[in-house]
Amino acid sequence: MAEEFLNTHNASILLSAANKSHYPQDDLPEVALAGRSNVGKSSFINTLLGRKNLARTSSKPGKTQLLNFYNIDDKLRFVDVPGYGYAKVSKTERAKWGKMIEEYLVTRDNLRVVVSLVDFRHDPSADDIQMYEFLKYYEIPVIIVATKADKIPRGKWNKHESSIKKKLNFDKKDHFIVFSSVDRTGLDESWDTILSEL
C-alpha cells in the first residue's frame, strides 16, 4: 500500500510550467499523467491523493494548458499533462501543446513512468493510440489506466479490455488497470503499480 511509503494526503500543486526552464530543479521521481480531454485525469489524481479538488475537474475540456507539477509528500511528483484531442482548440494551440508535451516526455530525466488514461467505455481515439506508440517508441515505461469503469456492467469488462488492448496493439509486458473514481476500483492497484516503477 502507498501509505507505507508516503503520506498521499500530503500533496500540493507546486508549479505550472510551459517549458523546461520552468521545471523543478531536483531529482525527485516524476509520474506523468496523460490522456485526452475529459478522460477523468483530474478525478484520477484527486482519488489517488484522497482529495476532492486538488486537481481542478472541469466540465470544459482542454482547460489544462501547462504542465502542472504536484508535490506528494516531498517524495515524488505527479505531472499533469495537457489533455489532448480537444476540438475547440486551434491547430496552432494544439501544435504548441504537442511540442511542450513531447519536450517533457523525451528530455526529462526525473520521469519514471507515464500513466496513460483511456476511457474504458470506448475504443481508444487516434490520439490515445498515437500517445501509446510514442511512449513505446521512446521506451518510456507506461501504465494504461482505463477510467470510468463504473459506467460499464462488470460482465462486459473483459470485452472492453480486449477491444482497447487490440486497438492499442498493447504490449503484454505493460500494466493495464481498470479504474473508477466513483467507487475507487483500481485505486490500490494504481498506487502499487506506480510505486513499483519508481
Swiss-Prot record:
Record's keyword annotation contains GTP-binding: yes
Stored Gene3D superfamilies: P-loop containing nucleotide triphosphate hydrolases (3.40.50.300)
Q: Does the keyword Nucleus apply?
A: no
Q: Name one Pfam family in it.
A: MMR_HSR1
Biological process GO terms, please? division septum assembly
* GO MF term list: GTP binding; metal ion binding
- The residues that the entry says bind Mg(2+) are 42, 64
Q: Which UniProt keywords apply?
A: Cell cycle, Cell division, GTP-binding, Magnesium, Metal-binding, Nucleotide-binding, Septation
The protein's required cofactor(s) are namely: Mg(2+)
Superkingdom assignment: Bacteria
Q: List the GO cellular component terms.
A: cytosol
Q: Which residues bind GTP?
A: 35-42, 62-66, 80-83, 147-150, 179-181
Locate the EngB-type G domain: which residues? 27-198
Give the protein family: Belongs to the TRAFAC class TrmE-Era-EngA-EngB-Septin-like GTPase superfamily. EngB GTPase family.
What does the record give as the function of this protein? Answer: Necessary for normal cell division and for the maintenance of normal septation.
Report the protein name in the record.
Probable GTP-binding protein EngB
The protein's organism comes out as Streptococcus agalactiae serotype V (strain ATCC BAA-611 / 2603 V/R)
